[in-house]
Each structure stands twice: as structure tokens, then as C-alpha cells.
Amino acid sequence: MCLESKPGNSKTLSLINQGYQILAEYQLVEQEQLRGIYAIPSYSSCLLWFGVIFIHSGCYAESVFRFSILLPDQFPNERTLPTVIFQQDIFHPHICPISHSLDLRCLLKDWVKDEHHIWHILKYIQAIFADPEGSIIGNGVARPLTELNNFKAFHLLSQNRIDYVLRVRNSILWSCKHMFDKPPIKDPHYIVLERYLPHKHLAVMKSSHSQ
């Protein structure tokens, strides 16, 4: 007996298959064991990922930046790049001061299934904050202005690093002030940060060490 294939069934199977592929992406992220940066698919939609990066060195040290990764509808089968949007304005040549989006064109021109992965994006995010000067240089020369999202940040970084660091400091202070804000959306997978409470967290630490 052959089951009739209906358009609705085909779409459902396609979504299930996509879900498994995105779950595989998350497993690859875990296998990379990246330090200081975390990302997880939203509970409500696997095409939306929540992320946060903790920066401990360089001119962005002490900052905690939240971001979202929006995957294209046909991910990973279409060549359109994912979209990375930070929750706040961050002064950086590759981050748009209006939309807070990160330009991924310096990393990838198109998305290629089985060759490119979400952990590549996470490592790129780490790299642009660890070495902002290096992020605006490609093959020993400055990147074209068309590959930059914030010309003022590019100019200051190139000509006056002291002023650049002062502007970056504003981004750091804002991130520290708002890192414990309530989640903007109700999603159980949203990454929530809590203030350190000895009576609560010491018990958790002791429990984890005893296992």
C-alpha cells in the first residue's frame, strides 16, 4: 500500500527535517566548546537563536553583549547568510549603529550547506571583538568601505585609537548596566543572567563538585 503524498505532508516533513538539521548545528556548537560565547535556538522557533558573549580582554574587556541570530526560512539549503543583530548599540566598524546588525560579508559571501556552520559565526563574533584592527584588514590592506557598517568607528580606529576606546567604553558601561534586565520576550530558552547570590549559587556549586 502506497501512502498518498499531499502538499501539507510534504511541508511538515520538510520542517521536521529542517529542525533536525538545526539541532545538528547546535550539537556542533557544543562540540566546539567555545569559551565565553553561548548560543541556543529559541523554544518558539529554531530559526531564531539567542546568544551572549562575555569579553575578558582587549578594548572591549568587561562587556557582556547579547545578540540574536536569524536563520533564513530555507536554512541550511539556501545561500542567503544568517543575520546577526546585537541587542544594543556597539561601537565597532562592522556593527551598524542603527540596526545593530553585524556584517558577515567579511566572513562569508554565501552560505554553503555542510561547509559553513553556526559555530563559524560565533568564532567570527569573538574575533572582531578580540582584534578590531585585524577585522578591518584583509590580506594586508584595509577592507573596502562597502564592507563596513560604521564608517565613524572605522575612521577612529584607524586614526585615533584613544578616542575609539573612549567610545567603546560607553558600549561596555551600557552592557554592564543592563545585563540583568528582564527578558524582552517570553521564551524558556532565552539566556537569563542572574546576580550572584551566595546562599543560592554556593549550594549549586557544591552540588556540581560532588557529582
From Swiss-Prot:
Gene3D superfamilies assigned to the protein according to its UniProt record, in alphabetical order: Ubiquitin Conjugating Enzyme
Residues annotated as signal peptide: none
Family matches, as SMART domains: UBCc
Cystine crosslinks: none
Domain UBC core as annotated: residue spans: 17-177
Pfam families: UQ_con
Source superkingdom: Eukaryota
InterPro entries, per database record: UBQ-conjugat_E2_core (IPR000608), UBQ-conjugating_enzyme/RWD (IPR016135)
Alphabetized SUPFAM superfamilies for the sequence: UBC-like
Similarity comment text for this entry: Belongs to the ubiquitin-conjugating enzyme family. FTS subfamily.
UniProt name for this protein: Protein crossbronx-like
Organism: Drosophila grimshawi
